[in-house]
């Protein structure tokens, strides 16, 4: 079975898993719009959900002429750049060599292949050739030569779709990337909640649910790490979604550095989502021939509440993310002395703990903080190996 199809007549990209459908369409003026993500829809193409009407004070692209019904400010799009009349949050912001900060991304080409795309030096899901299919869509700024390769891999039996973006400069002048999200998605006319997991030292992974209103909402980190303060995983769901019932969408960024997850509910009730590297103090210059790859977002959809979504991620990470010989066998068990002794230990105490660990079948004993010189508290001897 083909899990990714392109319907030439309708110009629709149709991505399927066993329990979800994801569709995009190339519309007027080579604009790539987002159509649908959710329950399977059989052979249907969801092309009638986009309603083009005149929205006051929402501008229209130059190519549209006097047609006031086609506005990038209200269309559900797949991946947008700043400076084209769409004033919502966006996926890409750049600075051109002449100081311009716009990029006008137009559909250029696509390719469907077997297997999973790869990202250089970044963690990502992996697959055997028969476990996944990949779609690569190329959007191009025809003035600067900057291209955005939108990468999608479908894991049909896991109900997972992964996304990433590869930026490539083909023009003669350099382009500085100021913001490069790994994914962007629009939901039409939907009242949604966001579920995220905040925390602090000793109080990690606290769930919080927020109603999304007509405003911007975000979670993220600029600590250099994803941190226990905000996990790079967010769920969007319907207002009535519970553990065993309701629609929910998971977004997990496979990256442990600065990150952001942002939403915006716009003037007509559409919800836009972006996720990726936090743009705070971010800048990456691309000379001709250079590329930049974003981290991967692992997406999934469940029509059966949070429990089903959780199990989808468990299976995906266990089978296609963790690279370890222990994926399918019991892992070694270790004991750490820290909570048992803190700084107050000697050789006899440590030997006793290790001996008891061996007696009950544990595999390793780990000596924690305090083995330095006169390391009796947090204020002395850290790093003193004498």
Where are these regions (language model features)?
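Conserved, mostly hydrophobic/aromatic
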Residues: 19, 165, 289, 335, ...
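Short Pro-Gly-centered flexible turn/kink motifs
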Residues: 95, 100-109, 284-303
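Conserved mixed alpha/beta catalytic, RNA-binding, or beta-rich assembly cores of soluble enzyme
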Residues: 263-265, 277, 304
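Polysaccharide-binding surfaces and accessory modules of carbohydrate-active proteins
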Residues: 4-6, 10-14, 18, 22, ...
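Short acidic, Pro/Gly- and aromatic-enriched capping/linker segments at domain boundaries
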Residues: 1-13, 270-287
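Aromatic-lined carbohydrate-binding/catalytic grooves of carbohydrate-active enzymes
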Residues: 326-386
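Short loop/turn motifs at secondary-structure junctions
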Residues: 161, 176, 293, 360-361, ...
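Terminal connector regions
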Residues: 31, 155, 299-332
